């Protein structure tokens, strides 16, 4: 339990740092180039531990298909996130992008999974937390608000489908191999 909590908090911290950096350089760098750099660095860092993981023999064609979909939707979602943060304002786009857990839970339920009150409370806490943190963010849109909303929605749907397909694939193969192969497909997509 403590290991899961530590990993979750570490992931949240790193993802937050990532989003902050994207916001800092978003207006000065090409979104696709930033995405490709992040994907390649992630793939390189994951490679040693993923390739040494056991269970590659359980990686079937079906798993490969799910993993390819996960990688495709991750690249799509991340590109949407980068574009949304470039346009801003953060107080508009972050809550929309951050609402992907709602869609992830819906995907899980569509596959026959259950979501109890605790899951929905967690999702609500995430969305409200993002909204509260970004509420006071200064800045105006660098483009049309509808365009920013569109890219934000693409990010939310992309991330929700990423996690949905990744979790499905991880039911049949080791998580590390699923994440790494999805990252490779995302690199090819970007």
Predicted features, each with a name:
Residues 1-33, 141-177, 182-189:
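Glycine-/small-residue-enriched transmembrane alpha-helix faces in small-molecule transporters
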Residues 1-14, 55-74, 113-128, 173-186:
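Structural signature of hydrophobic alpha-helical transmembrane segments
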Residues 3-11, 37, 47-51, 55-80, ...:
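Loop-to-transmembrane-helix transition segments
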Residues 16-29, 75-92, 130-142, 189-190:
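C-terminal ends of transmembrane helices
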Residues 23, 82, 108-109, 167:
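Small-residue-mediated transmembrane helix hinge/kink sites in multi-pass secondary transporters
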Residues 27-34, 80-96, 113, 171-178:
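Structural motif at transmembrane-helix junctions in multi-pass transporters
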């Amino acid at each position: 339990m403590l290991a899961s909590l530590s990993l979750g908090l570490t992931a949240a911290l790193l993802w937050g740092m990532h989003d902050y950096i994207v916001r800092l350089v978003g207006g000065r760098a090409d979104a696709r180039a930033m995405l490709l750099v992040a994907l390649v660095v992630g793939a390189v860092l994951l490679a040693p531990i993923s390739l040494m993981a056991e269970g590659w023999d359980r990686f079937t064609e079906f798993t490969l298909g799910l993993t390819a979909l996960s990688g495709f939707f991750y690249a799509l979602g991340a590109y949407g996130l980068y574009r949304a943060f470039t346009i801003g304002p953060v107080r508009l786009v972050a809550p929309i992008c951050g609402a992907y857990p709602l869609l992830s839970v819906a995907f899980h339920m569509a596959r026959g999974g259950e979501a109890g009150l605790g899951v929905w409370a967690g999702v609500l806490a995430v969305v409200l937390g993002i909204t509260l943190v970004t509420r006071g963010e200064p800045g105006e849109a660098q483009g049309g608000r509808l365009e920013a909303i569109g890219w934000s929605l693409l990010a939310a749907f992309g991330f929700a489908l990423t996690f949905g397909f990744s979790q499905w694939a991880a039911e049949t193969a080791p998580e590390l191999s699923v994440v790494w192969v999805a990252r490779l497909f995302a690199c090819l997509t970007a």
